[in-house]
């Protein structure tokens, strides 16, 4: 196109005949934007320091109209997740992988623009801030796995970096919230009734941990990522776009969530987690994933904890809204969450998949974990008390965690996108917005998974 324009300009300069007039019935194609509405990433090595094969592109052409539920998703929604949980988990994982891993090397997988089967979409405004998207695969920093958190031989702290995406039905609601790139609409989530049934969300979680210390990471799915220079090293001030180092990161966990109306009584979502185990040695390493379990509710009345039987995967028989994979010898041992609710290897063992995501709202009035909370009396909640159990309620898609907040229907990414946008505006305008405050306090996103308190686990398992 550029050569054609140059040639045309040259011909006109040399006195060539004027081009024929445009027909009145011809409508010229709309001009292509040089830049998309939202930045793709925040951090990439300086030019000359590293030349990547390709860079991450944010999938942001959100559907204007709500897409129909795909037939394959209809089949997933027909599987009884309470009784045939493994079939449900396997079907969702196959749906996530289809079109994203075939006929390409590991490093070229999950560039969503390459998927010829279906469209997936990213949440914008994950590029901003010190934990923002790196430019090779779109990974954002989540949590530090302290020594021995991932396994008994893990001596070196490791960082978790992740990228998440939504299918077309989920992308439709993201597009409604971000219809105006300069003024997001948090209320769009509640007005839509939350994410539509048939929304599927996936997140790939990578760790800087080595197979030498975490044996199930052998035969890895390995990417290069532009991350912090050392495990546990986090910038204390502003981070420059070229700050970081290129290191190998390895797939450790895949999370999924399905908006399934059969779970309406407990919140409308089914969450699942898969753990990587390279010993499976499938023809594609992306298939070396073992389902850890599903959860569709928080079991709000269950405060019990049960110790694991030596050599077996722990579980709590009191839980009725969680199912844990207890019989698969290929499942790496996992610590699980509070009261042995579903929680993956890099997740917090004082929470659960559903509990974390249930806090998604704007602004973030309450923190993501009960261990981060402070009561009105200035005290921390006690494990299992009434304040603690606020994080283990069953809230619906239009219910916000705090009455003063606006629900993001379990999307921490969507909540963070608005927080990041407004915080960025604070810097550019030198001002603040009332919507950021509650009880005269600014409430920033505190970290998508949250570290275990340094003073230890307040919920000691009992017999």
Residue ranges and their predicted role:
Residues 18-352, 360-463:
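Conserved small-residue
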